[in-house]
Amino acid sequence: MGRKKNRGAKFAEGDRVFYFAPRACEENGGHPPEGTVLRATRKSGYWQYQVQVAGTDRITTWDEMLMGAVDV
């Protein structure tokens, strides 16, 4: 997958990320869910990312303020 990064976005397409929202962690057994960025969009002055959650076929939208990169 190409590593397309939108200007000003924190994460690029294909980046592996964690989501630190309290509810998401609670739903994932107390651990932050991991996913892969599919697309970034700017909405109301901040970035949102469509992410495919690891280990599932679920695609969801995460806010940049609650995301962190996976160091590899």
Task: Describe the role of every protein-language-model region.
Residues 2-4, 12-70:
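Basic/aromatic-rich interaction segments and small domains that mediate binding to polyanionic partners
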